[in-house]
Amino acid sequence: MHARQRNVGNGYRSGSIGMGMSGSRISPERPMRGHGFYGSEHQHRGFNRGYGRGRGRSKSYHNQLPPPLPPPPVQRRSSGGDVFMEAGRLATEYLVSQGVLPQTVLSSKWQNGNFRKQAGEFQSSRSQEEARMDVSAPAAEKRRYIDGYSSAGSRNSLKGRRSHRYDSDFGRSGSWSERSKAFETETGDDSVSGHQEEQPLAEDIASSVQRSASGEFMRKCEGAGDSESVLDKYNLQDEAQSKTGSSSAGKDIVQDCEISKVSEGSSSLSAGSGEMKGRSGGNGGEDENQTAIEDGSIHQRCEDASIDQQCGADESFTKSGIDLATLCKFEKVPTRTRSSLTAKGPKLYLSHNIKDTSHNSGLEEEDQTENRCETRGQSSGKADSTGDENDQVEDFALVQYIENSKCHRSNSFPSSILRDNSEKESGLELPNLHRSHSVGKVGEKRPGEGSDLEEGSKRQRDWVAVSEANERFNMFKTSGNQCDPEEEGKTSSFNKRLIDGAAGKRVSHESLVNNSTYNRTHTGRTGPGYAEEHQLFPASFKMCDLNLGGASDVNDGIKESRQAVDFDLSISSSSKSLEFGTSTRMSNGKEIEVINLDDDQEVVKSSNDPGRKQEAAPYMGIDDVPDYNERLMMVEYLDSFTPINQGTSSVPQNNNTVSLQDREGAIGNDQVPNNTDDDSIFMSLGEIPLTFLQAWDQPPARGYEKPF
């Protein structure tokens, strides 16, 4: 299919030798392949290329052929002026018919852009192309056919499709190299490859200029009349603009660059602005009427003509410090965070509000205009094909104001980002500061309310209070020798009340510890002080003290049910005392012992008494087992290994008197009880005995020898 568009060996086109115009000028659309077209194409290949490139070659091979010589540009230059004159004449007629602007004001680039898109939309279907072929003059067809196959048809249909694909993606953002690369990827299609090989460079430049000049407005222009003049202009305008450098393309490039420079840090905003401009112009160009085209051209001209002035005015407003909030009349108020902060914490927000008054006003204006612009952009983006000319005429002032705000937004974008961040941080931090301030006040009130609790807890950590407790409770030391059992019960109930109280938990226990220590050291084991010790301390301590005194067992059983409530408190507090810090037998709260090492020695001395052992026997089941019992258990455990010691001692004796066989037998006899002892140990530990392993290893070895 591509051979129609290539030079043959003698330098002529295939269509000019003998192919009919109706057969060779069929549009390169895919649905036309099956209508007898492939046969005629193959016939031309075989006729013109007799050296064997016709039948067996694929399209990929034809794409790899070297590009043909470019056509002589003299023919295009001779008629290029006529096309521009015709385009200017049509544009002038439109303007005069409307009477909006004079002939000299309207720039030629919008005329060219409108007619380009009009031609692209006109060539998007096969029926329109066939109608164009019927209207075309034979001389024009001859010239266009020699210059390139369907230079108006394939080229315009290509640009019509490409404008739909890439204009919305690029907008006014993206470099020229990216656009040209995207166009080169587009030219891989079957309907484009031949023409792209003829003029790749001119097509790339012209397509990029055409895309930047026309923008989004070309998407909606559809014109059915004046097709031949439009196509003549559009066919010859690409190379004319690429070689002569027309003022329209140059101005558009300059303005496009200015927009990109103004929006350095906000390419997305500038792209959105470009798309909005294209859409605002394209909404009025949907109808096929001339008035719609005129309105679109007016919008485009006015926006591009005044964009630099608007940017300059915005810069002057920004630099001069004029409050833009006074110029806008919106009903919106600042966000809820700002208003709530002014109501809740006026003192905290006052200084910050004085500093950021200008920032707040600028941000309010920017946020409100951004909301309006986003609303307008969404309406024009979603309903891109539903706008009419009346909306454009009514909203022309709004479009200008939107462009003004967009330019201001993109110009002051970096500073506005900083201000937005500062406002967001202030809006997020100020409520937190207010809350933390209130929490601080609550925290200040709490020490006033519960100061006694904190002082009591701090005294427990600061061990200076122990000496104070010793001095404070000297009365208990002296009264312990003189008080009656009734007074002892009163003191115990008093201490119990102190333990139950929130403020006196630690102090009362320290007093008890010191008092009991004094009673043990001074009054002996059997006396009123010792009885007081048993009454003051809980039952868990008395179980340990039975080994020493064993005097008041009945009182212990009576007091155990009463003071069981304070067991955990006394244990947790006593574990932190200095006296118990020297004890080496504190594994957990239940195993705390009041007995010192010196007391244990006395227990060992008195352990020969059988009656004492019987008294200690009922308490063997509890974790706190006396040391002498543990020693006896260790001795019995060591006595169980006596055969091992005897065996090791008997081995060297047998070495001197017994022969090797007897010695081996003796060793074997020694191993037998050793194995039995090891078996008993391993079975107690839950492991497998060694003798069982020895018997286990032998039978499987015999069994494994059989298959191998």
Swiss-Prot record:
What ranges does the record list as Basic and acidic residues composition bias? 442-461
What InterPro entries does the entry give? At4g26450-like
Q: Where is the composition biased (Low complexity)?
A: 260-274
Q: Where is the composition biased (Polar residues)?
A: 238-249, 410-419
Record's compositionally biased regions (Pro residues): 65-74
Region listing for Disordered, in residue ranges:
1-79, 119-301, 349-390, 410-461
Q: Which domain of life is it from?
A: Eukaryota
Instruction: From the Swiss-Prot or TrEMBL record, give the protein name.
Output: Uncharacterized protein At4g26450
